């Protein structure tokens, strides 16, 4: 049963008009490329090249470091300059391979892939794993692992997350409009892994052109359906999307597979098509650069490892000095202290905000208005959870389901007292989860 929406949520200014009509532009890096070994959930990748080695575009430079891991490929040709810790967009230092770009873009000779119709399920999964594909719309969970549930026959829905509900980001929107065929072909490949499953494309109703495009592409596909979802943040959250498209509910202790679902986003499914049908490893992605602080917001096809400062240059550079630069969306993304960091597998956007775009408020006392409760998609009481967090009361925080918070930021967005609810709850949630692992 498709409900097409969920309880709670908010309607922030979406800011998408800045970049939604800008076609995808291929950009080439100028300087060195930096490849962090941790661009995904799980074990870091392990370098298989050394300083001084010459590498080609499409060559594996790091292999998966375990079952839950993913290999990394060079996105340019050049020479390995050094392997050392470098900063990631999140601000942590991670062991990284630095490649000096020779500007030649010599590419490995890919072997002619086997016809998808002739491939076994194991061969399809291996192709996905070997390509280094991870979730490109969230935390970067290795896709081969996600597509390998213990009981595949119990999976009856493959959900393509086409919501792109975060404000400003238009990368998936442009991907669907310009390369929607890759998304549909990728869904066909995934459906070959799950005999009993149906493919659902969940698209918010503020993207009628995407809905029309996907309906046209799937009109002769009986195992696929395009669902027009109500526009509301965080419609693209995994739990909210599953509930809106299937009517099934999951909590933080469950995986989507426990509800018979697998969820992947537009970029990930498109990468699956290119890997399985064309033999191409995961080497680049679409990144939105937006915000009033840049001259020409747009959508760029950027190779992994490219310096994010170069992407901002591709968007015309700064119009004014930005007050804040965010990696990801303004609701769930994070502020960066430098743009001298690489584009990674999970880099969906770079948002450069002016002082006028950034809220500057001093928090005051809670007025018990209940707005945070009304908008919470996890049906929690954020004001109370924030109180527990501020008093370091982990027991009460856990007892009142604080671990169910998805840190969407809806509560902070509507709070008239401007309390930093998301930050307080998120901090305590991380502490509680870390302590749980120690037990």
Predicted regions and their residues:
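Conserved hydrophobic positions within beta-strands
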Residues: 78-80
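Flanking helices and flexible, charged tails adjoining ferredoxin-like Fe-S electron-transfer domains
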Residues: 102-127, 132, 137, 150, ...
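Ferredoxin-type iron-sulfur electron-transfer modules in oxidoreductases and energy-metabolism complexes
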Residues: 347-363, 373, 377-439
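Hydrophobic alpha-helical positions that pack around
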Residues: 196-308, 314-319, 329
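N-terminal, Lys/Arg-enriched amphipathic/low-complexity engagement segments
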Residues: 1-48
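Histidine-anchored nucleotide/phosphate-binding helix
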Residues: 177-192
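Short, well-structured beta-strand-loop connectors
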Residues: 50-63, 82
